[in-house]
UniProtKB/Swiss-Prot annotation:
One of its GO terms (molecular function) is cyclic pyranopterin monophosphate synthase activity. SMART domains: Elp3 (SM00729). The lineage of its organism: Bacteria, Bacillati, Bacillota, Clostridia, Eubacteriales. This is GTP 3',8-cyclase. The gene is moaA. Residues 4-219 form the Radical SAM core domain. Pathway: Cofactor biosynthesis; molybdopterin biosynthesis. Keywords: 4Fe-4S, GTP-binding, Iron, Iron-sulfur, Lyase, Metal-binding, Molybdenum cofactor biosynthesis, Nucleotide-binding, S-adenosyl-L-methionine. NCBIfam families: moaA, PRK00164.2-1. It comes from Desulforamulus reducens (strain ATCC BAA-1160 / DSM 100696 / MI-1) (Desulfotomaculum reducens).
Length: 325
């Protein structure tokens, strides 16, 4: 469906839970956050109903996120349900990778096409400092499993944090020469309770790119990678993978935004950084028809803003795991 700014909205990101088995320093406080009661979170069947309605108005790509989506009980069943919808041509997953290896084969059989891993360090000790949990070896095993199953393109999402992992950017770049992996450096976003901390540790993508070019020389920009995202991709000479940058803060990509976000408790957000939400949980539980749900989704698309205004300050106290990354 085309919105008011001539953007084709064809991509729905679904947060299936606000729970997570890690406690990343930029995402939530050490004690975690107040969890949404299970009764308030949509069932897998309700998520599938939303997908069916959304597909009627042009949604073609689905990404399952969290929290950590793989902690959701019976999550494989949701992939199976979505894959039966012939209008959906791409089903992807964003995960921290802790549980992925043991579920990977079942997920692929259920319809998973590709996977993104959140991995902010290649050093187990630094990884533990960032996640407050560790389990680096589990994550690395999951990445290897995704490559083995050819869930291409396999992407690594690296949140760039000054003083934490900025000394590892070259190591991530070298990784793309060794294996067919696509590393994306993501600018730290000032979201939720971690807002002041994030502002002080921000690194612009341009600074990262400049540092890599000083080390490796000019990077090739004639690169395309499968996906619906906003990353700009580069590659090192003779590399098997690519290096990408997601510049949500320094150079927003709102003009090309093609997505909606559905929170675990059934609120549809036209913009991740906006305040407006459209309630789908209530009509779902009141027996709304597929057509009625599609009308609500259409309304949300009509209200999608031209761009975010995060530079004016983040006023939502919820953290990313609660909204859906």
């Amino acid at each position: 469906m085309i919105d008011n700014y001539n953007r084709n909205i064809n991509y729905l990101r679904i947060s299936v839970t606000d729970r997570c088995n890690l406690r990343c320093v930029y995402c939530m406080p050490p004690e975690g956050v107040k969890q949404t009661p299970h009764s308030e979170i949509l069932s897998l069947e309700e998520f599938a109903r939303v997908v069916d309605a959304a597909s009627d108005i042009g949604i073609r790509k689905i990404r399952i996120t969290g929290g950590e989506p793989l902690v959701r009980k019976n999550i494989v069943n949701l992939f199976e349900k979505i894959s039966t919808n012939s209008a959906i041509d791409d089903i992807s997953l964003t995960t921290n990778g802790v549980l992925f290896a043991e579920m990977a084969s079942d997920l692929k059989k259920a319809g998973l096409n590709r996977v993104n891993f959140s991995l902010d360090s290649l050093n187990p000790d630094t990884f533990r400092d960032i996640t407050r949990m560790g389990k680096f070896n589990d994550v690395w095993r999951s990445i290897q499993k995704a490559l083995e199953l050819e869930l291409h393109p396999v992407k690594l999402n690296v949140v760039a944090v000054r003083g934490i992992n900025d000394h590892e950017f070259a190591d991530f770049a070298r990784l793309t020469k060794e294996i067919p992996i696509h590393v994306r450096f993501i600018e730290l976003m000032p979201i939720g309770e971690c807002n002041p901390w994030a502002v002080g540790n921000f690194i612009a993508a341009e600074e990262i790119l400049h540092g890599l070019q000083q080390k490796f020389g000019l990077l090739d920009t004639q690169v395309k990678v499968t996906g619906s995202g906003p990353a700009k991709y580069y590659c090192l000479p003779n590399s098997k993978g690519t290096i990408g940058f997601i510049t949500a803060i320094s150079e927003h990509f709102c003009a090309g935004c093609n997505r909606l976000r559905l929170t675990a408790n059934g609120q549809l957000r036209p913009c991740l950084y906006g305040k407006q939400e459209f309630d789908l949980k209530t009509p779902l539980r009141e027996g709304a028809s597929r057509q009625e749900l599609a009308k609500i989704i259409t309304k949300a698309i009509r209200h999608k803003p031209s761009q975010h205004h995060m530079e004016d300050g983040w006023r939502d106290r919820r953290v990313m795991s609660q909204i859906g990354g």
